[in-house]
Amino acid sequence: MKQITNIYILVDTSFRNERNKEKLQTILNKYSRALNFEKGKAKLHIIGYNDKAKILHPFKRITTNGNPNLSEGLKLLESVIKYQRKYDEKQTRSVFILHGSDNVLQGWNAPLERLFDLKEFAFGLRYVVQYGNHDKYAKQAFSRFTESNDKILPYFSENRLTSLLSSIRRVV
């Protein structure tokens, strides 16, 4: 059985991120294109969050509305991880990329702590791609998500993702 690397991407689809909508669409297309080279060794899971969270398709147009409610995205991420655990027996280290805007609503603490109870999230590689100048709540949320300020990045390129996936393959 093949070993699968799961890539989970959380995208802020609130009104606050309207100005980055086209950039996000391009980035999601590039992520999907990067995974085409993996040919069944990696799965891409894209979760958009605002007042409600939903699964996104990389080639369908992103619509923005609502507030940047990160807790909704984290709850759906927890459900997706548990679902993947049932069906992917041979998993490698997971990759989590959070594309956040400059604002986050409060209430993200409890869902994030529940995620740290899942081994896929606790031992996964976690990055934040942040747009704009973040407020103190966004800074706290992003720092806690990555557990390291050096993983809060201004961008995350297609090349970085492919090299990260190949390094995971070499370790496993």
Region locations from a protein language model:
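Von Willebrand factor
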Residues: 2-57, 77-80, 93-100
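Short, charged loop segments at secondary-structure junctions
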Residues: 18, 38, 50-82, 86, ...
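Well-ordered alpha-helical segments embedded in enzymatic catalytic cores
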Residues: 27-30, 72-80, 110-111, 163, ...
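Arginine/glycine-rich "motif VI" loop of SF2 helicases in the C-terminal RecA-like domain
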Residues: 35-38, 88-89, 116-124
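Conserved beta-strand scaffold positions in the cores of enzyme catalytic domains, especially
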Residues: 46, 126-128, 150-154
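Von Willebrand factor A/integrin I-like adhesion domains
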Residues: 60, 114, 133-172
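A contiguous binding-surface segment within folded domains or other stable secondary-structure elements
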Residues: 65, 91-92
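VWA/integrin I-like adhesion module and closely mimicked acidic/polar interface patches used
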Residues: 65-67, 103-148
